[in-house]
């Protein structure tokens, strides 16, 4: 056990022998009846379309690596499972491990060659970076900062649904931070764009890594100021004010979207405040 957590992100050296390995491709992981972690040396002896291998951390003190595969090939007695499945169900420590491994795998896939001169990139031992030996370009794992906000109006909250959502589910508003703006400016702009209302008195609540594929969600509460709801065409299927005692189906418990809603409910009712997962 490492500290109080079973999973600890890190960079175990690929030159060392042994450990566990995850096989990843297109945000899916290979698994069999024993789970997702395979003996590293055994899996590497299989005929795999390997693109890259990276150390990603330790599980119960043992080093863990990710093999990024070119395609999700079929192996006897094994199947591919989507990352999102582990977010919704099962062990949260395991989901954190898989989310990190997926982001590193995607980064390795997308940065095999230099975007400046086309030379094959090389992983560095001293930090998590791909470097071009020809022109020196550095590429770090990508993070895309996004705001997510619950707009409130007393005992009402503004919730919306995208055409991509599970039928019937409503959630908070979210959007990516654009170049040149602060996260707070992004909150005001995205709310205005998505539902046509103005907000103020922003309160930062917390953040959550969201590996679909590489977002960092920064969560807020914001108070309604003015305006009528006008859903953004092609982005928002429906948006409504909901009373706290008559909420629609909501996002998964582990999501920061659900946490923003549950936290506001707790504060209005005087109940104990929930803890943000992760």
Swiss-Prot record:
Q: Which EC numbers characterise this protein's activity in its record? A: 3.6.1.-, 3.6.1.22
Residues involved in a divalent metal cation 2 binding: 190
Residues annotated to bind Zn(2+): 114, 117, 132, 135
| UniProt entry tagged with the keyword Manganese | yes
GO MF assignments: magnesium ion binding; manganese ion binding; NAD+ diphosphatase activity; NADH pyrophosphatase activity; RNA NAD-cap (NMN-forming) hydrolase activity; zinc ion binding
Record-annotated residues binding a divalent metal cation 1? 174, 194, 235
Concerning CDD domains, the annotation shows: NUDIX_NADH_pyrophosphatase_Nudt13
As its record notes, the protein acts as a catalyst of: a 5'-end NAD(+)-phospho-ribonucleoside in mRNA + H2O = a 5'-end phospho-adenosine-phospho-ribonucleoside in mRNA + beta-nicotinamide D-ribonucleotide + 2 H(+); NAD(+) + H2O = beta-nicotinamide D-ribonucleotide + AMP + 2 H(+); NADH + H2O = reduced beta-nicotinamide D-ribonucleotide + AMP + 2 H(+)
Start and end residues of each Nudix hydrolase domain: 141-265
User: Which of this chain's residues are annotated to bind a divalent metal cation 3?
Assistant: 190, 194, 235
In this chain, substrate is annotated as bound at 84, 127, 140, 208-215, 257
Keywords assigned by UniProt, alphabetized:
Hydrolase, Magnesium, Manganese, Metal-binding, NAD, Zinc
Cofactor(s) needed:
Mg(2+); Mn(2+); Zn(2+)
- The answer to keyword Manganese applying to this record is yes
**What does the note accompanying the cofactor annotation read?**
Divalent metal cations. Mg(2+) or Mn(2+).
Motif extent (Nudix box): 175-196
Could you mention a single GO BP entry for this protein? NAD catabolic process
InterPro entries recorded: NAD-cap_RNA_hydrolase_NudC, NADH_PPase-like_N, NudC-like_C, NUDIX_hydrolase-like_dom_sf, NUDIX_hydrolase_CS, NUDIX_hydrolase_dom, RNA_Hydrolase_NudC, Znr_NADH_PPase
Q: Which GO terms describe its cellular component?
A: cytosol
Q: Which family does it belong to?
A: Belongs to the Nudix hydrolase family. NudC subfamily.
Functional description taken from the UniProt entry: mRNA decapping enzyme that specifically removes the nicotinamide adenine dinucleotide (NAD) cap from a subset of mRNAs by hydrolyzing the diphosphate linkage to produce nicotinamide mononucleotide (NMN) and 5' monophosphate mRNA. The NAD-cap is present at the 5'-end of some mRNAs and stabilizes RNA against 5'-processing. Has preference for mRNAs with a 5'-end purine. Catalyzes the hydrolysis of a broad range of dinucleotide pyrophosphates.
Please name the PANTHER family in this protein's record. NAD-CAPPED RNA HYDROLASE NUDT12, NUDIX HYDROLASE, NUDC SUBFAMILY
Assembly and binders: Homodimer.
Protein name listed in UniProt: NAD-capped RNA hydrolase NudC
Origin organism is Pseudomonas aeruginosa (strain LESB58)
């Amino acid at each position: 056990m490492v500290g109080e957590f079973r999973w600890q992100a890190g960079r175990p050296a690929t030159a060392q022998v042994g450990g566990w390995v995850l096989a990843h491709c297109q945000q899916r992981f290979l698994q069999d009846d024993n789970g997702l972690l395979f003996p590293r040396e055994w899996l590497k002896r299989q005929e795999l379309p390997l693109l890259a291998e990276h150390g990603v951390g330790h599980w119960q003190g043992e080093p863990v690596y990710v093999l990024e595969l070119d395609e999700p090939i079929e192996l006897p007695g094994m199947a591919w499972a989507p990352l999102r499945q582990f977010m919704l169900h099962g062990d949260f420590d395991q989901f954190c491990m898989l989310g990190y491994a997926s982001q590193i795998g995607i980064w390795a896939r997308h940065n095999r060659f230099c975007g400046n001169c086309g030379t094959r990139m090389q992983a560095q031992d001293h930090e998590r970076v791909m470097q071009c030996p020809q022109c020196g370009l550095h590429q770090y794992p990508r993070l895309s900062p996004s705001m997510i906000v619950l707009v409130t109006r007393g005992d009402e909250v503004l919730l919306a649904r995208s055409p991509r959502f599970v039928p019937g589910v409503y959630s908070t508003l979210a959007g990516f931070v654009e170049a040149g703006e602060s996260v707070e400016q992004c909150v005001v702009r995205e709310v205005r764009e998505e539902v046509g209302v103005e907000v103020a008195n922003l309160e930062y609540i917390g953040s959550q890594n969201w590996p679909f594929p590489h977002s960092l969600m920064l969560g807020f509460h914001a108070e309604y100021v003015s305006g009528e709801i006008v859903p953004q065409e092609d982005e928002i299927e429906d948006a409504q004010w909901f009373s706290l005692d008559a909420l629609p189906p909501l996002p998964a418990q582990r999501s920061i979207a659900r946490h923003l809603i549950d936290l506001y409910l707790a504060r209005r009712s005087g109940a104990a405040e929930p803890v943000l997962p992760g």
